[in-house]
From Swiss-Prot:
Similarity comment text for this entry: Belongs to the PurH family.
Domain of life: Bacteria
The name this protein goes by in its record: Bifunctional purine biosynthesis protein PurH
Catalytic reaction(s) noted: (6R)-10-formyltetrahydrofolate + 5-amino-1-(5-phospho-beta-D-ribosyl)imidazole-4-carboxamide = 5-formamido-1-(5-phospho-D-ribosyl)imidazole-4-carboxamide + (6S)-5,6,7,8-tetrahydrofolate; IMP + H2O = 5-formamido-1-(5-phospho-D-ribosyl)imidazole-4-carboxamide
Domain notes: The IMP cyclohydrolase activity resides in the N-terminal region.
Species of origin: Elusimicrobium minutum (strain Pei191)
Amino acid sequence: MTQERKIKRALISVSDKTGLEVFAKGLHKLGVELVSTSGTAKFLKAAGLPVRDLSDLTGFPEILDGRVKTLHPRVHGAILYKRDDDAHCKVIKDMGIEDIDMLVVNLYPFRETAAKAKHSFDAEVIENIDIGGPSMLRSAAKNFAHVAVLCRPKDYEVVLSEMAASQGALSYATRQRLCVEAFTHTAEYDAAISEEFKKGLNHEFPESKIVVLHKTQDLRYGENPHQKAVLYSQKKDFSFEQLHGKELSYNNILDAFGTWDAVCDFDLPACVIFKHVTPCGIGTGKVLTEAFNNAWACDPKSAFGGIIALNKPMQRDIAEAISKVFIEAVCAPDYDLESLEILKQKKNIRILKRNSPLSAAYQLKSVGDEVLLQQPDRTLLLDNKWDCVTKRKPTEEEDKALKFAWASVKHVKSNAVILTSESASVGIGAGQMSRVDSVKMAGMKFEEYLQENKKPKVLVIGSDAFFPFRDGVDAAAKLGVSAIVQPGGSVRDEEAIAAADEHGIAMIFTGLRHFRH
């Protein structure tokens, strides 16, 4: 269908008045009669526009402090009747109902109000549940063949332009598109109410869960060029601000989130480098330059083309260090002008800014037609459990290194083993099906590290899960490891403890596993 519909009368009732004055003046200029509810009518009259009060159209006043103002047959009849149905037209004429050709409505700010409230069921939250607005939006969207419905200020300009070019009319295609937006808007609104009230009832994992996603970015492709991809967010905008560089790829985004999540686990100035969604270098220091050097030294071959995250604002000295190596992107809480100028000399580097840790309450992962949902792994220690299970206790330096290793290994793909000093990873074994193979891989990377660096004074291992056999401890001993941190919990824990005692290794059990798949 290509049938145009001329807009003669518009009902406007909005909470968000962004762009409304310009839009309403444009409608008035095109000869559209404006009808409005009390608050919006007051706004439009203050802008010098002639406006009919809705109560004049319905013959019925607003009641119950505005809870009932648009729920009236003269409103919904005017919106819902089919203009090409003789029986409908006769009813409308006989009852003296005046047409409404356009509905402009957005809804009470429920999400914003709930976000500020102490409890989901506070009176102010309840009062910001819109009833009349969604009802009108659904009516107008259902009858899009005859009525135009707008619920987003960003559509005002496009609609006005089309009407100006079409003697005040809108095409079927435009009305159809606006219909979809209206139903999406009401669905999201109802979902927000439902999820907020489930939260208020402490329903952590309810029988049904509604997740609303907003498209924030088109991507060139997915993990591989033959896969189509797009970025959606549970918020309206992408949570990193991009200050410079090429558009982010699917893989860049995965690494950006991974490296940022990891670097936020450290209080000291820290640098984390990711490649293929796992760390290839983690370092801390008194200053960021030291942290970067510690992280980069771990595995510069793998770090080439990776993504770097810093947990402190970028400054000139660290920007100069980063500018000398090839990376895809850098993330930091902030950048001074000098550091930005230095980094921007590399035209393709993506410069990302974010000043808060990841805060999502849940992680979602699709598996076929199903979705796995879990709490994020944000716990470093469970009830401060840090139990030495061996005869030898860790020294102060070893304990510091073990805590660094434990904070680091939780971000490595399982099976994960990491060799560290007190402030730097020096060998990472990731993604092996056998834990002893992860130890051997970390050892291989450590041998490469020693070709360019001195052996650290303290060398420890962190393991994301228990050692199922003593072979992992034996392999660690061959590397010169003096202390190990692991969750414990294997039926063969005693064998691993005995092996550690034989080698004079101190071993800590945390009682907390950090699988990452």
